[in-house]
């Protein structure tokens, strides 16, 4: 197959950041995606309806002229989140609340330190139909970074899912065989997003031949057996798995430093890279489900009605992009050849 037409896709997990960075990130995503779930880990974090609504307005202001792109807003759960915060957020159009263990990712220091304290919040979310999005890693310093996702399932996620069977849960950016197996065997109220980097790469691509800072993200890339498990999961065509890029921009100097930031900025190449993965797996016909239908179906939202066409044609991802402030950012897969291209 050398051409495929999909219903317009959505991105069910990304980071736009804020300020002048929005002038880069919003158009990059609006290029192909109709909707996106916007992460709330700003400084300060987006913790309530008022902050979410204000952030949404800033995103809308950064859309290209004529764009109908729709940001889907989330709030950041903390130990101070109240039931009323959840009710108010839902009334304001917020679609989900995000659970970050404290210290698990960029700007997550304000996050949850005692999971059981949030159980009444999860109960309210289940009652009113707000989704729970989970960054699934434990964060104790003595636990090996490569083991943190599997331990989170065992200690925390299984408890949440068992205690609240009516709560819709998205296990975000899964990276392990254990996560793929957990989601597959869980109820229909549990799903997962998978990033392009975790389908394309494993930890050798981060560490062999030198440290590759632009492949560094959290959760960190795992060994090959986990990459293969994720590839096998999407190849099944299961509706439990859908597209979430976790596109996460950091300026070049913040990645290429003695203590580099975590995140891959994939918005400019993500759909094309997913197409490459599905083509390599011999299941390109299953890309539309992953990119365009499984996500809205799980969220209870209508599918998009437009289409995007991809053709099998090589192109090279730019080596860097200049941000509105004049600083460069290095996109994911910079300088690499991609085999699928959006038909203009």
UniProtKB/Swiss-Prot annotation:
The active site is at 246. Pathway: Pyrimidine metabolism; UMP biosynthesis via de novo pathway; (S)-dihydroorotate from bicarbonate: step 3/3. Belongs to the metallo-dependent hydrolases superfamily. DHOase family. Class II DHOase subfamily. The lineage of its organism: Bacteria, Pseudomonadati, Pseudomonadota, Gammaproteobacteria, Alteromonadales. Binds 2 Zn(2+) ions per subunit. Its cofactor is Zn(2+). Keywords: Hydrolase, Metal-binding, Pyrimidine biosynthesis, Zinc. It comes from Shewanella woodyi (strain ATCC 51908 / MS32). It catalyses: (S)-dihydroorotate + H2O = N-carbamoyl-L-aspartate + H(+). GO terms for cellular component: cytosol. Gene3D superfamilies: Metal-dependent hydrolases. CDD domains: DHOase. Substrate binds at residues 15-17, 41, 135, 218, 250, 262. Zn(2+) 2 binds at residues 98, 135, 173. This is Dihydroorotase. Zn(2+) 1 binds at residues 13, 15, 98, 246. The keyword Coiled coil does not apply.
């Amino acid at each position: 197959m050398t051409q495929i037409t999909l219903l317009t896709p959505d991105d069910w997990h990304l980071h736009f950041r804020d300020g002048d960075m929005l002038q880069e990130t919003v158009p990059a995503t609006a290029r192909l995606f109709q909707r996106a779930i916007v992460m709330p880990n700003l400084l300060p974090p987006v913790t309530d309806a008022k902050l979410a609504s204000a952030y949404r307005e800033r995103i809308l202001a950064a859309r290209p002229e004529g764009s109908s792109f729709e940001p889907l807003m989330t709030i950041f759960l903390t130990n101070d989140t109240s039931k009323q915060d959840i009710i108010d957020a839902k009334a304001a159009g917020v679609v989900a609340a995000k659970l970050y263990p404290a210290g698990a990712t960029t700007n997550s220091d304000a996050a949850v330190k005692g999971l059981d304290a949030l159980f009444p919040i999860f109960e309210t979310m289940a009652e009113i139909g707000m989704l729970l999005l989970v960054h699934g890693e434990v964060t104790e310093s003595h636990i090996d970074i490569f083991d943190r996702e599997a331990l989170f399932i065992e200690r925390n996620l299984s408890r949440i899912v068992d205690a609240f069977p009516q709560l819709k849960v998205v296990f975000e950016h899964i990276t392990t065989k254990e996560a793929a197996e957990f989601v597959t065997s869980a109820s229909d109220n549990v799903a997962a997003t998978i990033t392009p980097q975790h389908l394309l790469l494993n930890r050798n691509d981060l560490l062999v031949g030198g440290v590759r800072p632009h492949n560094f993200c959290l959760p960190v890339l795992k060994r090959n057996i986990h990459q293969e498990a994720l590839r096998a999961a999407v190849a099944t065509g299961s509706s439990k798995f859908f597209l979430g890029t976790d596109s996460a921009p950091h300026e070049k100097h913040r990645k290429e430093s003695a203590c580099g930031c975590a995140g891959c900025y994939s918005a400019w190449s993500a759909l094309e890279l997913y197409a490459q993965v599905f083509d390599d797996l011999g299941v390109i016909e299953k890309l539309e489900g992953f990119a365009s239908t499984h996500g809205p179906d799980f969220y209870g939202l209508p599918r998009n009605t437009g289409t995007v066409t991809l053709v099998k044609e090589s192109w090279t991802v730019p080596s860097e992009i200049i941000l509105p402030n004049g600083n460069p950012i290095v996109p994911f897969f910079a300088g690499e050849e991609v085999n699928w291209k959006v038909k203009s």
